[in-house]
Amino acid sequence: MSISSPSAASGHLVSVSAPAKINLHLEVLGLRSDGFHELAMVMQSIELADQLHFRNTADGTISLRCDDSSLSTAGDNLIVQAAHLLRERSGFSELGAAIELQKRIPIGAGLAGGSSDGAATLVGLNGLWNLNFSQGQLEGFAAELGSDMPFCLAGGSQLCFGRGERLESLQAMQASMAVVLVKDPSVSVSTPWAYGRCKELFRSRYLSQESDFEQRRQQLRESSWLNPLRADDPPPLHNDLQAVVAPEVFAVQTTLKLLSDLPGSLAVAMSGSGPSCFALFADVDSAQAALKRQQPAFDAAGLSSWCCAFRSEGIKLEA
């Protein structure tokens, strides 16, 4: 790595968007020796994004402000953790940043909003501080901070294995698909709870050998609907955590039922550990038309909804 003299001009502004993700496939294979679950997933970036702005500080402080007062801006926030990690790895202890977060991805929704914000911080401060870390190095830092963060940084369409940090890129789509995404704003689901409950219910089905894990990975790699993703052979959508969460979270049941009534939907599923759910469509126009038709029902149920195209790339500097 070659590091230039770090930037210290306090007026310089860098902006980065941090897109949400959905899980087109989430399979819990078994338990790893480190206690985490071994996963086989297909993750997809979508055009619902937080916005982050970064400025240098002359006194070396790192601070975070957010337009959503319910979100912690202290050291437990992945943005703050990512900033401190990057500064530590740079070797320049005098570096500081004032960070502003415009929160658009719902919190605790199974959309990796916090992980994406942390990944965006690595990209934004790498640019602001003129550090010149490579994409591979940034993905390594991201993996230290969270299982979803390497994907959030790389973005697009990816196979994700291990805890989710091992990425294999998929071919780019020729035409973007889209989703209608829906969440009950009053409900959140704890990811550790969801995986813990999965272990309680289904541990007897878990695979235990690496050879068995690899067999399932290869079966997913060879799925007919991959490479590239396409509307004429759409992903069947699968999420092992849906069988865990839906029976115990009524909002997920309601959301899936309303989504299943959307005209033109190709498939319906929960994302991640929930409670966000989505319906898949061949294109944005079809998704927008379906959302417009079903919007009164979503509103009556107190549900928030979005129409989001698939996003083909990861996190990039905007300025």
From Swiss-Prot:
Its EC number is 2.7.1.148. The keyword Metal-binding does not apply. Pathway: Isoprenoid biosynthesis; isopentenyl diphosphate biosynthesis via DXP pathway; isopentenyl diphosphate from 1-deoxy-D-xylulose 5-phosphate: step 3/6. Pfam families: GHMP_kinases_C, GHMP_kinases_N. One of its GO terms (molecular function) is ATP binding. It catalyses: 4-CDP-2-C-methyl-D-erythritol + ATP = 4-CDP-2-C-methyl-D-erythritol 2-phosphate + ADP + H(+). The active site is at residues 21, 148. InterPro entries: GHMP_kinase_C_dom, GHMP_kinase_C_sf, GHMP_kinase_N_dom, IspE, Ribosomal_Su5_D2-typ_SF, Ribsml_uS5_D2-typ_fold_subgr. It is an enzyme of class 2 (transferase). Gene3D superfamilies: 3.30.230.10, GHMP kinase, C-terminal domain. ATP binds at residues 106-116. Keywords: ATP-binding, Isoprene biosynthesis, Kinase, Nucleotide-binding, Transferase. SUPFAM superfamilies: GHMP Kinase, C-terminal domain, Ribosomal protein S5 domain 2-like. One of its GO terms (biological process) is terpenoid biosynthetic process. Catalyzes the phosphorylation of the position 2 hydroxy group of 4-diphosphocytidyl-2C-methyl-D-erythritol. Belongs to the GHMP kinase family. IspE subfamily. This is 4-diphosphocytidyl-2-C-methyl-D-erythritol kinase. The lineage of its organism: Bacteria, Bacillati, Cyanobacteriota, Cyanophyceae, Synechococcales. The gene is ispE.
